[in-house]
């Protein structure tokens, strides 16, 4: 059985994040400045729509959590989930996201319409972890894995937008989350290490899968936008 120590797991999963981001068509093209500015706006508009529904994923973890009174301390896991969700709600993250969209040139985010791939990703966590055969601990591990993508992903975004697209304001949203999401991973994983009976291999695999899902979401959105523009041009 693999260790659940947060540092050891972080090293395993960060290597996974690094490899997937390096293989990503969207992040590779963004880093090189190869994406047209209007397509950059379109991709981040879809990210904004997904981000507006991200808090629901925490709700799935709460619904799937163990009842009070069991041998393991469910309170600690719930406490960490609530702390992370409270930061999502009270940190004016939505306001920062709107400022970022404004810096990209998106004046009216209400006009953005979700692509099917965005809706599918937003609902993927529910489809994967709500079934009775999936444990709440696996859901929390997956959520923690998604959080761990943030620092590396955000570093690519901030560097690329400032270097290739002249975006120098509105980036606080990504700078804030670089540290915040890493803290969320540590807090959630350390709580899991003390409170779970689930095989560590299943937890690490759930985290790996969600990392893959998140990077794939960006690539799927990018591909859908390129395909739509290609059809319009033909």
Sequence positions of predicted segments:
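Non-heme di-metal
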Residues: 2-234
């Amino acid at each position: 059985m693999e260790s659940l120590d947060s540092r050891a797991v972080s090293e395993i999963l960060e290597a996974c994040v690094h490899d997937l981001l390096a293989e990503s068509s969207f992040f590779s093209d963004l880093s090189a400045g190869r994406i047209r500015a209007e397509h950059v706006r379109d991709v981040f508009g879809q990210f904004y729509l997904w981000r507006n529904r991200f808090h629901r994923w925490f709700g799935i973890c709460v619904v799937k959590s163990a009842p009070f009174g069991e041998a393991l301390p469910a309170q600690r896991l719930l406490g960490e989930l609530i702390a992370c969700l409270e930061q999502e709600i009270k940190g004016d993250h939505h306001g920062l996201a709107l400022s970022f969209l404004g810096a990209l040139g998106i004046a009216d985010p209400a006009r953005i319409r979700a692509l099917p791939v965005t809706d599918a990703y937003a609902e993927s966590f529910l489809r994967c972890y709500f079934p009775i055969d999936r444990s709440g601990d696996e859901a929390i591990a997956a959520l923690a894995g998604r959080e761990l993508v943030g620092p590396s992903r955000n570093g690519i975004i901030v560097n690329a937008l400032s270097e290739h697209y002249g975006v120098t304001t509105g980036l606080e949203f990504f700078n804030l989350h670089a540290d915040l999401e890493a803290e969320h991973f540590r807090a959630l994983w350390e709580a899991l290490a003390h409170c779970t009976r689930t095989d560590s291999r299943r937890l690490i695999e759930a985290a790996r899968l969600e990392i893959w899902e998140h990077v794939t979401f960006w690539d799927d959105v990018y591909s859908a936008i390129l395909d739509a523009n290609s059809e319009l041009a033909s």
